[in-house]
């Protein structure tokens, strides 16, 4: 008889393990509620951090939920947030024990360190408010935040909700989100670095098909490393277009894997994709560029030897590059300068790690200003973006301490630079479109539309 692998076994199917208290669960065991990977035994059953936190909060806060459908919604890894009523019902059905909740476990004592931090935050708020008087943003609504033109109200709202930094379960939520995003990013990088895959032809058709990043056969065929030495060469407009189409194809596949897509209509999904299309290829290029001076090799020079100036360039995996030059200012050169100085250098000065990058990219994607969003879609995206803003600041506070506020503010301001750079690249492709109409993803998502 064939025995299924451990990763396919649900924990409630392992009675011998279930009865042993504090025993580590087998690697690959699935959450009994949503079938994500379980992080341990929580409230008497094997569950992931997300379901554990959801169950505890629902009971501690005495929340009541109502199903908007027939009361039997599917509770899976990618759709577990759709219906909280059915999710809580399944938690009980699978044996989660409310008596196992320790209600006083996470109470935070008022320590001197906490008092000092709150005083520092209060001082910062007062300082930001003083600076903001008379600015255009001071009359803007605090309930709506636009990451492309961030106001100080963004910072104030996040600081007021910074209790998440002290909540261990909230931190676990953020870490779980980042782990999922890093796994997804790893697949995107593998395809991008091998650049063997065939680019998508139609954005609409792509949104109807299954996600290729989850296709094991497809990934195996298209992620072989390229052999041989890669010689650098200057990127032409045609080569840049080729890489934009590749990155837009990856963006569509990446977007289809995001949990929020399960809650949106097709038109809302396409609206988000179109709004993010000019940004995604630029931020991928800026973050994943590696130049010779970034390696760990130190070259010792003679005392009288002057090192060669380091070219300020951004590289694609095939060796093509764009760089700052001494040519007269034009749209093409201005775009290079803005992307290199405003994004590439900024991320390196701030020492942005990939864990922060994937969360920041998610934040940029959730744009409630996207043209074509339905009223329900707009509201959904607004709520999700506020949640992501809080998670990003919470994560930075944990990882970077006092630097968090500076990094957070700079990332929000960098989104404006990305938007401006995107407008320049649109002009380049707009001009190119007049003489060369190809109806590729650039035409569909950036120039003409679907």
Swiss-Prot record:
Isoform b: Expressed in body wall muscle cells, pharyngeal muscles, rectal gland cells, vulval and uterine muscles and neurons in the head and ventral nerve cord. Isoform c: Expressed in body wall muscle cells, neurons in the head, nerve ring, ventral and dorsal nerve cords and epidermal cells in the tail. One of its GO terms (cellular component) is nucleus. SMART domains: HOLI, ZnF_C4. Residues 28-103 bind DNA. Residues 173-450 form the NR LBD domain. InterPro entries: HNF4-like_DBD, NHR-like_dom_sf, Nucl_hrmn_rcpt_lig-bd, Nuclear_hormone_rcpt_NR2, Znf_hrmn_rcpt, Znf_NHR/GATA. Its main location: nucleus. Pfam families: Hormone_recep, zf-C4. Belongs to the nuclear hormone receptor family. This is Nuclear hormone receptor family member nhr-40.
